[in-house]
Structures are given as structure tokens and as C-alpha cells.
Amino acid sequence: MSQHRNATHRLSFVFTVVSLALLPFTATSMCRAAAGPAGTPPDAPKAPPDVIIFTNGDQLSGTFIHEVGGTVTFHSDIVGDINIEWDKIKELRTQTKVAVLNKSISPEKKKLPPNIPQGTVTVADDKVNVHPENNAPVETVPVKDAQYIIDQNTFNKEVLGRPGIFQAWAGSATAGATIVQATQKQYTFNGAVALARVVPTVSWLNPKERTTIDFSGSYGKISQHAYISGGEFFPPTSIKSAIYHADAEHDWYFTPRVYFLVQTAFDHNFSQGLDLQQIYGGGIGWTALKSPVQELDLKGTIQYEKQSFINATDDVNQNLIGSTFAAMYMRKLPKGMIFNQEVSYIPAYNNLHAYSVSESNSLAMPFYKSLSLSIGTLDSYLNNPAPALPPTQRNSFQFTFGATYVIKSKY
């Protein structure tokens, strides 16, 4: 019993000594764990929020986005993005550094004055006070003269900078398919890509240039195997459909709503016997309607047009001088849905019978992040199809359904 007690006391003594020896290392490890991984600086304190005080005394904290034409856009985690008129604001204080452009400064001009006020701002008593860095003197701009108040990052990119040719592209890509395996085998594939590059990329600045590239296509085939019925042999049959369209356009704005344009377009429609229609032209466009929820563009061009038909002789193929008169309409609907419509009339002046008309519609319905369901129609009329057996129908109608991926600009 005595030996057992002595052994127990010795073990307790050894354990105590080891614990005391490891205590400094344990404390150091705990301090390091509390301080975070080695070499990792502590989190920087968040910048104080921007603050709006309304004329009724209410206060809202968040992030100042911009002011355009007397309307302030402000983001709050509670209410999201809101637009506020100056007459509803008693005071505005920003920690966000901004640039203030008065009415005498046009962002569309390539050369801007070197002394544009930049810094944090306070707005009170109908005055915008700009506080530059390095304790420079405060600059004051009357509220009524502050046409744009833009954060410095946006100012540097959209006003002073210019995206590269492969930057600032946005648009959508759509794909759909139908496959049937039965007595007849049927498959149809359709797809479309629509890209646009607008400079500047923000909608609240007047555009300087716009480039669009579009492609749409549909290919289908119905086939049936050979068979024997009543002692008679029936050979295999197949029916093909193919419709393709591609176009590109570049616009130069000389007013906020009117622009010069050059364009090219290519069309193929197997059902109408059209092997290839080529268009090269230029003209003028007008944005007749523009608002946050809808836009309408009207265009007219003078162009060269060449039509080549399938299995046609040279006297059937056409070299034409004509025009394209087109209208494009976009409407933003509730729940993030977007409706697009385009109508075009293409007359020929050296052959009045060689005209065509087309009309397309599309509706995109978002369902998950950048993905949408899309429904579309394409109706085209070609007045001068090539002679064929059976006779070619002048009208072609197409209905499509698919999934659309929205491509967002990273600029």
C-alpha cells in the first residue's frame, strides 16, 4: 500500500512538472490562435457608411452610387437601391470619393478640364462641398449645377478611360433541341448569340459608340427508313430545314439619340430556296424612345444586296441596290422578364419585286441566376424565291423554345 501511494505521488509530481514546463508554449499557441494565422494582418476596419438626412429628419446609411440630373441613387442593405430627388435631401455626407461634373462639362468630349473637383462630399444648403485629399481647399458647386456626381472608379473607367476591343461585351446565348425516335426520326437544334458593346457601359451616360453582333440558326431533319408494303418498295425519305442569320453593326453617336451606322447581314433559308443573301450598307439611326424600362430604335440604310439561290441559274440570282428600314423595341417586364421585337423591310430599287420582310420576337424569363427560359418566333417573307418543284412558299415561320445564358460585362 505504501509503495502504491509513493508511486502515485511520484506520477502526480512528474505530471505537475511537465504541465508547468508546457504552460508557456500552450499560452503562446493560444495567443497565436487568437491573433489568427501567422503573417495575417487583422481585419481592417470598415469604412464609415455614407449618410443621407432627409428633409423630414429621417436618416439612411449605406453607399452613395451616383447623382445624375438632380436624382441621387443610393444603396442601403435594408431597402436596396433607391432614387431620391435633391429637394427631398437635407444633407448628404459621403466617405466614397467622387468626381463632380457641372453642367459646363460634357462627359462625351474627349478632352476634359484638368481641375474637375474630386474627393469626399458634403451636401447642405443647396451646395455640394468637395473635400479633396491632402487638405487642399474645399471646392463648392451649387446643387443645381451638379449634373453628375460619380464615384472615382467609375469616373476613371467610363469618362477618362475606354474599354479595349475585347472588353465590355454583354449579351446572351440561347440553345434548344427537339429529338424524336419513332417510326420517323426527327431532330431539331436551334441556337442564338447576341452580343453588344456600348461605350460608355453605364446607361446613365450618353453613348458614344455601339457595336452589335448577332447570330441565330435552326437546323432540323425528319427521316424514315425504307420499307415494303403490299409487295411495293418505298425508298427512304428525309426532309431537311435550315435557317441561319448573322449580322454585325457599328454605330457612331453624334447626338445622344442620333447616330451614323454601318452594317452587314447574311441569311440562308433552305425552305425558301435561298442559299445566301448578303447585305453591306450604311445609314442613320434614331433612338426614338429611351427610358429605364423600354427603348425603341429606328434605322434606315442604303445598301448593296446579293441574293444567291439553291440550284439556280445566273439569271435568277440577284445583284440589288436597296435599303433596310428597321425598328427594334426592348421592354423590361415584371419579375425580370425582357421582351425584344424587331421588324425590318428590305426593298430593292433596281428590281421592285425583290423585296423581303422579317419580324422576330423573343421573351426571356429568368429562373436561376444567369439562366432564363426563352420563347421566340421568326417570321420571314421573301417575295422573289427561285422557281422550284414543288413551288417554294414565300413565307417561312419558326417557333423556338430554349434556355438562355446572360453574358454580363466584366468591365
What is the role of each PLM region?
Residues 171-173, 189, 209-215, 260-262, ...:
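Transmembrane beta-strands of outer-membrane beta-barrel proteins
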Residues 293-369:
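Outer-membrane beta-barrel transmembrane domain signature
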Residues 31-180, 185-186, 192-194:
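Compositionally biased alpha-helical segments
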Residues 202-211, 257-260, 291-296, 330-339, ...:
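Repeated loop/turn-to-beta-strand initiation elements of outer-membrane beta-barrel proteins
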Residues 395-411:
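Outer-membrane beta-barrel "beta-signal"
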Residues 166-247, 251, 263-271:
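Transmembrane beta-barrel domains of bacterial outer-membrane proteins
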Residues 185-191, 240-244, 276-280, 294, ...:
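Residues that define the transmembrane beta-barrel architecture of outer-membrane proteins
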Residues 173-177, 191-197, 248-252, 266, ...:
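Residues on the lipid-exposed face of transmembrane beta-strands in outer-membrane beta-barrel proteins
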